[in-house]
Structures are given as structure tokens and as C-alpha cells.
Amino acid sequence: MRKVTVIRPQKLHFPFSKGKILIDSIECETVKAGKSAEIEIPDGGHDIQVIFAAAPPVNSNMLRIEQSDGDTVFEVKIVVPLKNDPTYAELTKK
């Protein structure tokens, strides 16, 4: 497992400040603009999909992910599942 920091860029505006981000089935709190939250992801996790299980953002965009040591920085696309998509229901039930 690698610990990474999720950073929400200031330019992104989301209609909510609470919720969950599911990253390879690992949850972390949704990050407010300009703030960060640490999560752990499996090794080889560069194929991560970020899925908002709460209210989806207005526009899909990218989140910047960097390792806690600051060496590796990569971006992942936010995938917004449709609420009538069975995948959405599967991901959001806890």
C-alpha cells in the first residue's frame, strides 16, 4: 500500500462539501477546495478511477494525486456514474 494525498484544485467548484470518494474501493472524505486528505491505495494503483458516490460534480474533471513523499504526481479522472446505473448502486451501498 502507498499513502497518497488527494488535492482538490482551487479551480474546481463542487456543489457539496461532504461525501465520499471511492478509490479502488478505499474511502476517504471528500476534500474541500484547496484542502487535502491522505488515503492509502494498493501498489500499482496508477489505474485508479475516482468515483463520487455522493452528489456528482457539475463537470467531470481531474483530481491531482501525489504520494506523501512528493515524488510521484499523477492525475485521475473523476468518473460520475449515473444514478440509474447498477454500478452506482453497487458502489454506494454500505
Stretch-by-stretch model annotation:
Residues 1-94:
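Short loop/turn and low-complexity linker motifs enriched in small/turn-promoting residues
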